[in-house]
Amino acid sequence: MAARLLRVASAALGDTAGRWRLLARPRAGAGGLRGSRGPGLGGGAVATRTLSVSGRAQSSSEDKITVHFINRDGETLTTKGKIGDSLLDVVVQNNLDIDGFGACEGTLACSTCHLIFEQHIFEKLEAITDEENDMLDLAYGLTDRSRLGCQICLTKAMDNMTVRVPDAVSDARESIDMGMNSSKIE
């Protein structure tokens, strides 16, 4: 959870510095917080810790690579992305014209950032997780080179790669079966 918060915070802050306050609840049982001292920090007390999150002061061109997206209309959108950023981050930060892309904002709750990779790039990607695979099962236009853009982070080896957005989009959040007694909320 903390790692995800840091990733989201880093993406939101970009190259600016920010400060985040994290609340840590004590573990159940006697003794309160591990390592706490003094009265008032046991039981149900809440300790506050300040965490500083900051990006690099300036991004050099060496830290960026070129990525080509082919959107649903067949138009090629070329942009730059920072090494380490996800493909979802690249689309959002560069305001690329890809309708509905990243509806869940990278929380692995939809499949709207479904992308199809070139074979030579696909072979270099990190192994797919079970969670990503479950979301991809709900995606339209699934291929053997499909991945979710929110799960793929840029590396130097991806420079000048081309990824294709499938012709149709599917949002897994809209295809959840709520059971026989559920009604559609409009």
From Swiss-Prot:
Keywords: 2Fe-2S, Acetylation, Cholesterol metabolism, Electron transport, Iron, Iron-sulfur, Lipid metabolism, Metal-binding, Mitochondrion, Phosphoprotein, Steroid metabolism, Steroidogenesis, Sterol metabolism, Transit peptide, Transport. SUPFAM superfamilies: 2Fe-2S ferredoxin-like. Its cofactor is [2Fe-2S] cluster. Residues 1-58 form a transit peptide. It comes from the Eukaryota. [2Fe-2S] cluster binds at residues 104, 110, 113, 150. Binds 1 [2Fe-2S] cluster. The modification N6-succinyllysine is found at residues 64, 156. GO terms for cellular component: mitochondrial matrix; mitochondrion. The modification Phosphoserine is found at residues 61, 175. PROSITE patterns: 2FE2S_FER_2, ADX. One of its GO terms (molecular function) is protein homodimerization activity. It is found in: Mitochondrion matrix. Its main location: mitochondrion. It holds the Pfam family Fer2. Belongs to the adrenodoxin/putidaredoxin family. Interacts with CYP11A1. This is Adrenodoxin, mitochondrial. It comes from Bos taurus.
